[in-house]
Amino acid sequence: MDQHIAESIGRPDLIRLDDRLVCLRFETMKAVSALAAVRHLLDTGAVRRGDTLLDSSSGIYAYALALACHRYGMRCHIVGSTTVDHTLRTQLAVLGATLEQMEPCSDLKLDQKRRVERIHEILAEHPEYHWMRQYHDDVHYLGYAAVADRIRETLGSADGLTVVGGVGSGASTGALARYLRTGPEGRASADVELVGVQPYGSITFGAGHTTDPDIIIAGIGSSIPFGNVSHELYDTVHWISFDAALAGSVDLLRRHAVFAGLSTGAGYLAARHERGRSPERTVLFVAADTGHRYVDTVHARHREAVPIADLAPQEVTDRGRLALPWSRMQWNRAAAPAP
């Protein structure tokens, strides 16, 4: 029996949607990494119960860190993106977390920069606070070891598995690939490919020169370098626009009854494409959260969704040729692109 709701929320479901297409569905994915990170910090003496944990978030991590702080008797201070909605603000308030939300801003790149600047201001005022640094501290990898074990046990083996998901801070997909490839005893053995999903405008894989007229998909891209992204883990990268991700989210709900967020819709599109390219492999895509935050901006617009059969990626070998609504590039486990 779980000792706290955060443990249940962080445990994913594995759902077979179709032949060799599997959804790894979380209620709140980052709960698993936040819980393990806070537990590790307590165990190593880096923090003590009652301390204040601080970080920046566009949504999912804010809730996850608030839950972890509630579980372990810590205080939580979040500098939130403009994308934090009323429901999440209310949850954070009731959980006792402090939320500073950025002023409305149509440029999420600027929003991200302002959040980091505010973090540094808070640390100057309160040097006793512990900055969780979800974008840079690989303590956030730890929680995904148990998820990798569950995937391996459920599927019987990780061999021949392709993992697809939003890159974001790098911890989730990067950690899953690392743990699945090495196995439970640290032996490098499994044939696991990793496919990262990015929005246009993200600098993580060198697409900062592109723009999406609608919005950069919160949580899976970045306008600043992230230390937790290990580029050498990724075999392939897909860049997917808001409109294409919307179509994926709607189709996932309509076809498979999975109600999930916008990044999941993007991952679903990429996963279907990868399965078509390699029918001998099992493709697993990550659904990081439920669709409740996206009811008005995505699911209520279901009549606008393009049929996914009409969508296919443009194959590129040069990032200078990236184009909306969807591009795909073999990354081949290369190093990070030059700034």
Provide a role label for each language-model segment.
Residues 1-339:
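PLP-dependent amino-acid enzyme catalytic core
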